[in-house]
Amino acid sequence: MLTPDELRATVDDIASVQSADGRIPWVPDGKTDPWNLVEAAMALDVGGRHDDAARAYDWLHDRRLPHGGWHSYYVGDEVTDPTLDTNVSAYVAVGVWHHYLSTDDTAFLRRMWPVVEAVFDHVLEFQSTT
């Protein structure tokens, strides 16, 4: 378990690499993927940096593809791996719900719920009958 000082240092480090538009790369100026961005945003929420976490979800909101998912990797605004992964895309819903539970921010949930619905629709397109 992290001490309060360790938690603060961890979330401060995450916030230090977050860009103004909300993107959270693995390392400064490095690649970003939806799964790890959600993990980082959830850590920001645990550390009480709710506005920073919301900006991360806004980044995802603004880059959602028409079918409901995201590409696998981005550097800045450039797609560096156009692979589509339903597992990664669906994880965004976990983060959205975690942020809501951390903040009780119903305006955030209303803004992000269409994203959650779209990603579930996208993922369920790949569900098999067997």
Spans of features found by a protein language model:
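Low-complexity, Ser/Thr/Pro/Gly-enriched N-terminal "stalk/linker" regions
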Residues: 1-35, 46-59, 64-70
